[in-house]
Amino acid sequence: MNQQRFDDSTLIRIFALHELHRLKEHGLTRGALLDYHSRYKLVFLAHSQPEYRKLGPFVADIHQWQNLDDFYNQYYQRVIVLLSHPANPRDHTNVLMHVQGYLRPHIDSTERQQLAALIDSYRRGEQPLLVPLMRIKHYMALYPDAWLSGQRYFELWPRVINLRHSGVL
């Protein structure tokens, strides 16, 4: 029997930690760490809402730290803890509904209802995550939002899902 070597959350953790590690290799700055944290907010939220809520205030205090390497080491450990919680349909649903709120001013009530139905269908296990993600990405292309476009959530999950379904993993 062909067993999966990594689950999807483990692959996300590998990608996320690799990117964080590269920040340090390329010259660590407060701005780079804040940008990283901002790009990964939805990924973090999908993995652990409680850890996400703890990490936010920690990051907000980055300017209090004299030694950026010490901050980085603490942050890295906290990200490891956060990402050790596997993402689950409940938390993905929360993320998708959060994103739906960003799109609300741009999509009409029929589109909102259709998106809500796709999200709910995913929540009930009737659709894969990729279905509501692709609809959201479609709306993001029609109604660009800089913050949403920068979210790694919309790159990493489809990449992992596609790798899984292509037989690479």
PLM feature segments, named:
Residues 2-169:
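Acidic, Ser/Pro/Thr-rich low-complexity regulatory regions
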